[in-house]
């Protein structure tokens, strides 16, 4: 790769395997993203790392394209990475947990289950163990970024292990964790703020670019899957398919019907929130469906996205309002003379939030957080569609004549009406039935006996009742118009 020959990088030495981890138990680690590493070069929990970089000449656009191209992998090396967020709460009061309580949980996990701490300005802000990490979202949402795994059995085992560990430590502190897409009870002012530098910059910037950005930061939880591609053409097909079907996944996994103690008018308020968070960096990316689309076109898109920050001398420098294109030519007033490294590019790509996101893999970002069975079901659903050639081709054919207007309509209406959203001569539920069958077929052909993980999705589609509608029914009947029982209903 061109970039490899032009950057001399001082890298952190390996940790010496399991024995080394035991020696350093509970001590901070630093993860260094490099252009040559596989999935997850940057650890989600970490502050950005500062490589000792001697630039022989500035990065070019070709280097940025090459960074994305380096994600291409032969099919035998494709992996499945799952990320999921959850709300911590005090079992006695149902109140959101504060940073001090979260710090105690992180310390407890580090001591008891051999995780390494990640520290920013003397605050524990995450954990790392092998290729897994635990990080904190702005309002203290607890996120597991899973390791890249080969099968969905491994994925579900990882989810279960994580939930077991978090529950074991949390229960002793009177803390529970809730699997839902939007905070059902508490106002924005009730949510604690995590001590992470990048979030302070985002918190100040969000109200300038949309009315719901702070809700996105502090009151939402999602589950997403990260999947590989073999070539530019494979990436394009998967990107287009993922975007077209993202509203269908939003409907199936809709699980955020409450806000501040009552129904909010949506089945997936979390999904709706993204429509007025920051339209410069979110949405359905119609240009992905242009004939000219490829890695270079995505780089052009990302270059013009306003930046959030640059990380220098262990500090976040607020660069809001400037583009990465400005940075490429040294035109950041906040960091005069600074030029970007690949680290800066990698960090910038994490501040773009479309329904499907391209890094050196593709992220499917349309689903609400939910209980553990749905955390396993979401990656299964997408793997059956995108990792099987026959299913992927069938979906590509099915969606090839969908217009931008139709895709935008689904994106807009599904958060309100879910599976009952009209589409052409039927409903989203009809589409979901067809897509589910294609996913099952793809899983059968994979040959790992993974179809069973789709039972939860099967039940939703066959009944036509989304998880959110089930909760709304409980609210009106058994719960006597109180949201408090949801904390028990969706407790991990």
Curated annotation (Swiss-Prot):
Cross-referenced Gene3D superfamilies? 3.30.590.20
How is this protein annotated for GO cellular component?
chloroplast
Q: What is its main location?
A: plastid
Q: Which GO terms describe its molecular function?
A: ATP binding; glutamate-cysteine ligase activity
Where in the cell is the protein located?
Answer: Plastid, Chloroplast
Q: Which reaction does it catalyse?
A: L-cysteine + L-glutamate + ATP = gamma-L-glutamyl-L-cysteine + ADP + phosphate + H(+)
Q: EC?
A: 6.3.2.2
Give the metabolic or biological pathway.
Sulfur metabolism; glutathione biosynthesis; glutathione from L-cysteine and L-glutamate: step 1/2
What GO biological process terms are annotated to this protein in UniProt?
Answer: glutathione biosynthetic process
Taken from the UniProt record, the cysteine pairs bridged by disulfide bonds within this chain are 156-376
Describe the processing and modification events after translation: The Cys-156-Cys-376 disulfide bridge is known to modulate the enzyme activity according to the redox status. The oxidized form constitutes the active enzyme.
Q: Any idea which UniProt keywords this protein has?
A: ATP-binding, Chloroplast, Disulfide bond, Glutathione biosynthesis, Ligase, Nucleotide-binding, Plastid, Transit peptide
Origin: domain of life: Eukaryota
Q: Name one Pfam family in it.
A: GCS2
This protein's assembly is summarised as: Homodimer or monomer when oxidized or reduced, respectively.
Q: Which family does it belong to?
A: Belongs to the carboxylate-amine ligase family. Glutamate--cysteine ligase type 2 subfamily.
Q: What is this protein called?
A: Glutamate--cysteine ligase A, chloroplastic
Organism encoding this protein:
Oryza sativa subsp. japonica (Rice)
